[in-house]
Each structure stands twice: as structure tokens, then as C-alpha cells.
């Protein structure tokens, strides 16, 4: 019965909310934090880098918590006017971001370290494995439906495995 601020265009998040038996409350990137901070919703998806700028600590108060678990992965697109940029800009942008992957990961880890330890909640191993299986199933379902691009799926797996090399899906990449 918990209310979850959910980007209503994000099919994966909607499926997670359905799976856990919560109620989806449509939100945007501009409204998810205010809804959480004002108590309109019980749960909000947010990356660690949102904690400070979106003042998520206001909604957490003394009794709130943050699961030390990635329920969602976010990505972004650079939206431009193609005719206003030099030839090859798209490829050079992709190469720039690929070359600075480690810097981006460090930015995320710095944000996580900036969140007070008392807010972090560790899931029991069995529950974490259940969520990992649920999320993998949702990804597979959305990929089969053509919602997820298979190349993007490979990149997102790389991100998950970089963040947690012991993640169960990364074991398939290990050579013994």
C-alpha cells in the first residue's frame, strides 16, 4: 500500500511498483523530490547524486532510510540541434563520455559517501537476491518487447558490474 513517486513513462519502474504491490504516483524529474519531501509519497526513486541538490534529507527526516541497492539505473541523452554542431560531434561526445567513465563513477561514489551512514539500509541477502532476480526478469521482458535496446542493455550491465563486480549476473563474465 505504499505510494511511490514514479516517472510514468518509465516502464521498468512501473513494473517494479506493480511487482511490490505499491501504488504508483505519477511524477516528473521536477516533482519527485518535492512530493517525497512533503510526504505526498512514501518512496521515491533517486540516485545518490540527487540527495543534496534535491534536499532529499528533508523527506527522510529522522526515521527515513535509503536502501543500499540499485532498484533503477538512470541514463541521459544529450538533446541538441544537429545542424548547429560540427560534423562528428555525436561520435566525439560518445567517445568523451566513454573516456571519462571512471570520473563519472567517482562522482557517484562521492555522492554516496556524502550521505550520512545512519540513512543507509542493507537488505537481507535473500531479499536482495529476490530483487535482483525480479529486476533481471523485468529487463528481459522489456528487451523482448523491444522497449529496451540490446546495445544499451550491454552498457547497463557493464555499469552494474563495474559498480559491483560480485553481482550475480557478472559471474558469467569471469574466466577461471
Describe these PLM feature segments.
Residues 9-10, 28-30, 44-54, 74, ...:
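Beta->alpha turn/N-cap motifs
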Residues 73-92:
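A bilobed periplasmic-binding-protein/Venus flytrap-type ligand-binding module shared by bacterial periplasmic
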Residues 22, 37, 41, 98-106:
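Sec-exported extracytoplasmic/periplasmic mature domains
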Residues 102-176:
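An extracytoplasmic/periplasmic, membrane-proximal ligand-sensing/linker region
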Residues 15, 33-38, 44-63, 68:
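A ligand-binding cleft/hinge motif common to bilobed small-molecule-binding domains
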Residues 1-38:
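Bilobed "Venus flytrap"/periplasmic-binding protein-like clamshell domains
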